[in-house]
Each structure stands twice: as structure tokens, then as C-alpha cells.
Amino acid sequence: MAELAEKYDVIVLSDEIHGDIIFPGHRFVPYLSLGEESARRAWATTAPSKTFNIPGLHTAYAIVPHFSLRERVKDSFARIGATMPNLLSLEGSIAAYTHGEGWLDELIPYLKANYEFVASYVSSELQGVRSVEQEGTYITWLDFRQILRRSGFGPKRFASAMRTEGKVWLSPGHVYGKDGAGNMRLNIAAP
């Protein structure tokens, strides 16, 4: 990706909000760590909200190493009024990053166990559904394409039928782009 961004002179925005939630045996590589040239034409966003379960604080931040790009990003944020979070959000974020290591140490094995349960259940009980291999985070993808081919349903109709007839509300993958069609997102953070 970095080579293509350089070749076509494209700025990369790397959404790294799930970067702290990585399962053992896997590694997250921040885009900005790929080298100076990659960092010159990129910026990354992240937040404590996913890792520490504090989305209500509405806090996120951008890391923009290159000065001229940083100024453009700051100007864009200023135009939409997104310049500073409130004091509670700042203090909550600082507390999460300063004192949240124990939380994260317990969260990751919990999520890994939930993922393994879902993958096992899907494999043994849901013929035609495949759990997509997962390296971290609390959102798992379930591949329903085989069922869609057999049923003749399109992704939107299938998602609607899951909600209305199956009483299961998953996030339909097609809303995340055409490659997501036929997949559904499942939040595995809850018991």
C-alpha cells in the first residue's frame, strides 16, 4: 500500500482504532512505522474508546508526523469544529492509557475465548456459514455467501430476513463496501 501511495501521490489515512486489541501470536504494525517516506504522506487516527470501552467520551486523536500535512488536517478539523474534546474526555483518555493495562490484559484473552467459541459453534452448528480467521478486536466476520448462493437472497434481503425472521441483528457486510457483501459482522465483546 505504501508503494502505491507513493507511486500515485496519495495521502493515506490509517484507521488504527482497534490496534491495541491484538490476539497473542499476532502483531499490529502501525502504518506510520513503515518508514519516513510512508509517514510523510500519511496520518493515523485512533482512540481509547474501543480498547477501554469508553465510547461515550467521544475522544479520538490523529497522529500526523509531516508538518504540512498536519497543518492541512488541523485546518480541516477547525472547519468542522473538531478541535478539542471536553475536559472529561481528556481526563478519561489519560486515565485509560495510564491505568488501563490490567483491563487490557484481561480483555484480550476474554475476546479470544469468545472468538474461539463463535468459530467452533459456527463450524459445528451453522452449515454453510464460515467464521473468518481473526487476529484481534471484538468484531468478527461471518461469511454467509454459500447460504446466499443457495437461497437466492441478495445481501440486503438476507440481512433483513435475519432481523425480522431470525431475530438476529448482525451488521450486514455490504455497508462496509462491495467486498463485504455476503458477510455479517458480529460483536463478540458481550458474554
Model-derived features with residue positions:
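PLP-dependent class I/II
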Residues: 1-191
